């Protein structure tokens, strides 16, 4: 017994001591406290979420480098077995071609209303993989669905409008960092609205009115005068037109639909919706004119997917903004000069009205094209169309576009006399003065709202969500290496992870979220749970940074992606005639001459 106890207690700990010695010691910076980059560079050894961020930074750096493709597994006798690499005729293992991973990004809609929108736009606009600028061939039939979609939409644009969709823009010299973006409903609408009007910073609803950051002026945080006056009015009084309370999420506010400040966005969205419905009517008529096929096809050929909707928006954006700017400015000028009578009926959502007004809008839209281009270049959807990056939106109907697609209900008629309400004055003079005052207040409210656009009559839009699910799943399955950058949670996280499940998981995963796993929701789940589902590969690198996305995403951008772009540009300047690389070992070509499937040389 003594020998048994001695052998159980007196165990050699040499191996454990060696393992402990290899662990990273916790330490922070001891100098250079005036250099932010030095402080952030030491996050990896500081502990807690600083260490997780340091790991996310290292994973992001690996995401944008060339490396061997993912390992391939197959099920044999109920177990996953690693498929050995191909062997040549001489019996030697063939060298695998290194590729750049395809990066899938998930972004929740609220982030597009913050400064994270500019970070997402940078990731779409810039990249490190050079684009082939040689003469291009048409898209091949074995290309990915997004390649074929953009090629088809560009041909359709040329046939409809007689020119290329982006005549004012040069083709980017590099492919986008991203191959696909998944955004929740309302995200693209935030992107478009911010190109039309400014979002402002205010205090949180749970905070006192004066409790704001020192970076936000007190004037910006104070509610508008119209809101102050309305708050002073007794309950039940009617607010003046154009003083609708701004929409708010967190400490960010923006003009509500139909209110002052939202005229350009409203006109833009109505123009967009009318174009979508007109296009669908053309496609439907063309489909009905074709003979009935022998083989039944259960895919509606004239329907539209959410990714197709936002691709069309990116292709049409400059034209629509120029048209909307012309309509809004001309209507505003007529209101200012006092020569407008019935402006709500004379200007429709897409500038169509009386023939004279229509010709005037067409003539003036060209003069607004420079401003429209400048506004469009600030958006994610514009650069996504230019870089041929699909914007998937599985919760499409949650966005603001639905309110422009559905018919607007007419307001209920107000009764002349209500029980307990004011009694009509029998004095005719007082009645005339009352009418005069109402007319004056109506005139002032009309000038305050600047533009009242008559909602167009639109048909129902046939939307197909299943085709988008198939497209993103196919894109992940054909990718030789993938990474996931998920900002937030919910439907965008599930959609990106589920697509990578179809290829036995992503190789690199970064999740930025403050969601917790304790309620069992997908939004707060850790990467380890995704590993159990097969959404993250067994040999993959993954990390979850617990924190608010607007804190960590700009840091990740500044430390990883911006330096990579600077290095690529420096290389381009030093070697202007350097041979450009294209994506993929077997690259299907699109109309711009580059492959989009997998990046490699």
From Swiss-Prot:
GO terms for cellular component: cytoplasm. Its EC number is 2.5.1.46. Its cofactor is NAD(+). It is an enzyme of class 2 (transferase). Spermidine binds at residues 189-190, 494, 520-522, 529-535. Residues 440-451 have a biased composition (Low complexity). This is Deoxyhypusine synthase. It comes from Leishmania donovani.
């Amino acid at each position: 017994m003594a020998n048994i106890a001695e052998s159980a207690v007196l165990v050699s700990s040499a191996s454990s001591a060696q393992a402990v010695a290899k662990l990273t010691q916790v330490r922070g910076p001891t100098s250079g406290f005036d250099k932010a980059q030095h402080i952030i560079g030491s996050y990896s050894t500081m502990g807690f979420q600083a260490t997780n961020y340091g790991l996310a930074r290292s994973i992001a750096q690996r995401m944008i480098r060339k490396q061997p493709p993912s390992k391939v597994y197959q099920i044999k006798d109920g177990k996953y077995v690693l498929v050995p690499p191909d062997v040549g005729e001489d019996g030697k293992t063939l060298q695998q071609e290194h590729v750049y991973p395809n990066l899938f990004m998930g972004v929740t809609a609220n982030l597009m209303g913050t400064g994270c929108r500019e970070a997402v736009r940078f990731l779409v606009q810039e990249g490190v993989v050079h684009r082939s600028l040689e003469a291009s061939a048409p898209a091949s039939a074995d290309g990915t669905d997004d390649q074929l979609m953009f090629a088809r939409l560009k041909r359709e644009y040329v046939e409809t409008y007689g020119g290329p969709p982006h005549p004012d823009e040069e083709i980017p010299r590099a492919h986008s960092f991203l191959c696909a973006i998944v955004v929740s409903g309302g995200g693209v609408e935030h992107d478009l609205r911010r190109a039309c009007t400014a979002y402002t910073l205010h205090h949180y609803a749970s905070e006192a009115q004066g409790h704001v950051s020192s970076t936000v002026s007190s004037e910006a945080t104070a509610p508008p005068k119209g809101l102050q006056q309305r708050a002073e009015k007794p309950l039940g009084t009617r607010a003046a037109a154009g003083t609708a309370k701004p929409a708010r999420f967190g400490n960010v506010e923006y003009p509500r639909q139909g209110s002052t400040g939202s005229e350009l966005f409203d006109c833009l969205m109505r123009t967009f919706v009318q174009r979508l419905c007109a296009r669908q009517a053309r496609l439907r008529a063309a489909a009905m004119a074709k003979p009935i096929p022998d083989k039944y096809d259960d895919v509606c050929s004239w329907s539209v997917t959410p990714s197709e909707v936002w691709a069309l928006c990116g292709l049409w954006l400059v034209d629509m903004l120029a048209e909307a700017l012309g309509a809004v400015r001309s209507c505003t000028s007529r209101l200012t000069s006092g020569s407008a009578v019935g402006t709500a009926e004379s200007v429709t959502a897409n500038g169509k009205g009386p023939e004279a007004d229509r010709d005037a809008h067409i003539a003036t839209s060209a003069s607004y094209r420079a401003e429209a281009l400048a506004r469009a270049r600030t958006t994610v959807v514009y650069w996504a169309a230019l870089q041929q990056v699909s914007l998937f939106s599985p919760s499409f109907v949650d966005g603001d576009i639905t309110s422009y697609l559905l018919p607007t209900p007419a307001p209920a008629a107000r009764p002349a006399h209500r029980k307990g309400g004011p009694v009509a004055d029998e004095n005719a003079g007082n009645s005339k003065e009352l009418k005069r005052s109402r007319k004056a207040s109506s005139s002032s409210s009309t000038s305050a709202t600047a533009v009242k656009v008559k909602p167009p009559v639109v048909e129902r839009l046939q939307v197909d969500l299943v085709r988008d699910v198939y497209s993103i799943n196919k894109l992940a399955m054909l990718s030789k290496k993938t990474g996931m950058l998920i900002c937030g949670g919910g439907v965008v996280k599930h959609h990106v992870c589920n697509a990578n499940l179809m290829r036995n998981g992503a190789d690199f995963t970064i999740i930025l979220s403050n969601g917790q796993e304790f309620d069992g929701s997908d939004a707060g789940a850790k990467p380890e749970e995704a590993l159990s589902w097969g959404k993250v590969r067994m040999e993959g690198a993954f990390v979850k940074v617990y924190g608010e996305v607007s804190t960590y995403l700009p840091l990740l951008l500044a430390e990883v992606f911006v330096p990579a772009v600077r290095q690529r540009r420096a290389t381009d300047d030093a070697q202007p005639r350097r041979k450009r690389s294209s994506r993929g070992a077997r690259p299907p070509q699109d109309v711009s001459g580059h492959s989009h499937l997998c990046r490699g040389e």
